Amino acid sequence: MVPYRPEHVERYHEWMQSPDLLEATGSEPLSLKEEYEMQQSWRDDPSKCTFIVLAKEKCDMGATMENLDSQEDNDFVNRNLDAMVGDVNLFLSEQDSEDVSDEQEGFSTTDENENEKMQAEVDIMIAERWGQRKGIGKEATSLMIQYATSHLNIARFFCKINEDNTPSRNMFQKSLGFIQCDYAECFRQYEYELRRTSGDSVETLLGSRVIESFQCRVSPQLES
């Protein structure tokens, strides 16, 4: 996975011409100019983590990814535009006080773990049909949860899925261990969540669902 950059916008815009993808993601169609503006806005927003998922079988890793986010080296990005298969996002917010579990109330409030009452909405899209039903969405989502647990100290993950999107519902429930916490009848939309308590490791959170070898991996820039 790599940060969402301007070079990715045209392909992303092509994806979002699909009525099915617009409906599944709850998105509105944008012009190409608006898509570029949205990319810049999301990149500058500290409450959003947005990454493009690359399929390993189509990815030319080259010598290094260390300069992936540098203006001096765009070669990796341009070389792998055809490996783009989808995107994964985290939208960060603070939990409402009534939504914080008893276990989370016991969290320390020091600066080091001030995010322990934060939550993240998870949004995953595998846009290319050739990349679907291969487990890439599960792996990308697991990787983002592992990163957010280890580095952002997120206490609650949740997602909202249309009731007729059975593959996504099965992935979050059966493959990732999310549980249903709400249903909005007016939107015909389920909400699922995965909570952690103080001290939970990612292994405890995801159990056997932790993936040791990913088809897609995170750019080192995630940790910068």
Regions from the PLM with identified roles:
Residues 19-41, 55:
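Conserved GNAT-fold acetyl-CoA-binding loop/helix
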